[in-house]
């Protein structure tokens, strides 16, 4: 069996899909369906079982067995970069992850988990997986950074696989439940379909992020599991592209609309990553050599998926 925490969420459900595409269906999805809209991410997928996150954590802490586990993909977390409840964030992202990690280490189960580019904070260069480059801007980034630091202490002694992926700006299918935290591409598409002018912040040609397609993210996860490589790795494309490029690809698909530029909100000033670009040196050294989709390629594929029933 394979366990995917956060399996009804954005990246988790895409990992379930990638496993299904390889003929793997013996999957336990762990999630919190308090947000009932997330179930739509699972309706076209094949899984063996579902468990609530709280029940799962109780069983993990009690050391209960789930049968033979081939791997745990730990994608379950509070991923809101605007959540400032530090206790909630640390319980959800740090303590929960530690419990799962030790469960896996004791049983030599491969443990693949979601870290984040938020660990780098407001940098504009050198997004490198090393302590001197890490200075998170928000409590979400701090919770991810702290767990990475914890993993770094354990990695040299570990007898089983531990791998963390620092996701950059992931976009693509199955993110609709994320609301305001969904990608720019998702929001632009919604605005166009509602007959509204698609909106970007003023200066969006100057805001550049490493936008990575979720299908590529799932592919990297599975490759590392299949190849048993451990470590903490950036997971982006290695290219910074502008929000304007995302908008251009969206408009090109729809063949209509023009962008309305809105003022940059005061509440985000100083807490907003204006530039991200993954350094892929370590990922490539580990042996992953496949190309990543450009914004034009990924957004076009995503638009086709979003508008498949239109």
From Swiss-Prot:
Signal peptide: none annotated. It catalyses: ADP-D-glycero-beta-D-manno-heptose = ADP-L-glycero-beta-D-manno-heptose. Substrate binds at residues 169, 180, 187, 201-204, 209, 272. Disulfide bonds: none annotated. The active site is at residues 140, 178. Pfam families: Epimerase. One of its GO terms (molecular function) is ADP-glyceromanno-heptose 6-epimerase activity. Its cofactor is NADP(+). CDD domains: ADP_GME_SDR_e. Binds 1 NADP(+) per subunit. Keywords: Carbohydrate metabolism, Isomerase, NADP. One of its GO terms (biological process) is ADP-L-glycero-beta-D-manno-heptose biosynthetic process. Its EC number is 5.1.3.20. Pathway: Nucleotide-sugar biosynthesis; ADP-L-glycero-beta-D-manno-heptose biosynthesis; ADP-L-glycero-beta-D-manno-heptose from D-glycero-beta-D-manno-heptose 7-phosphate: step 4/4. Coiled coil: none annotated. NADP(+) binds at residues 10-11, 31-32, 38, 53, 75-79, 92, 144, 170, 178. Belongs to the NAD(P)-dependent epimerase/dehydratase family. HldD subfamily. Homopentamer. Contains a large N-terminal NADP-binding domain, and a smaller C-terminal substrate-binding domain. PANTHER family: ADP-L-GLYCERO-D-MANNO-HEPTOSE-6-EPIMERASE, NUCLEOSIDE-DIPHOSPHATE-SUGAR EPIMERASE. Catalyzes the interconversion between ADP-D-glycero-beta-D-manno-heptose and ADP-L-glycero-beta-D-manno-heptose via an epimerization at carbon 6 of the heptose. This is ADP-L-glycero-D-manno-heptose-6-epimerase. The lineage of its organism: Bacteria, Pseudomonadati, Pseudomonadota, Gammaproteobacteria, Enterobacterales.
